[in-house]
Amino acid sequence: MLSFLKLVFGPDITVKGFDYTDDTPYYIKDGYTPQLLSWGDHACVLLKPNGSSWRLPTLKKQLKKFQELCSLPCALCLDNLSALQRRSMLEEHIPFVSLSQQVYLPFWG
């Protein structure tokens, strides 16, 4: 994923671990792996689901909950994304990075 992001954003983009805040619900702590994505003055938290089976309404609800607790913009990091899932996420304005080389981070302009 990082090599693709470097092609899109340039060599200054980095990905590193991110620690949850104490008030993060356990269902988010147990269900996702967080990473901090940084590019120049911009940063966001990527939430990657730990399981391979997920439902878009659940992801959207949990991303919104985590966004309320986090001081940074948040996006989903997904392994596989079908065309239908991608279209649904774009229509609902859900930020994401897909390992299949697709990126939608509207808060970065």
What are these regions (language model features)?
Residues 93-105:
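Charged, structured surface patches that assemble and position nucleic-acid processing machinery
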Residues 1-94:
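DNA-contacting interfaces and partner/effector-binding or oligomerization modules
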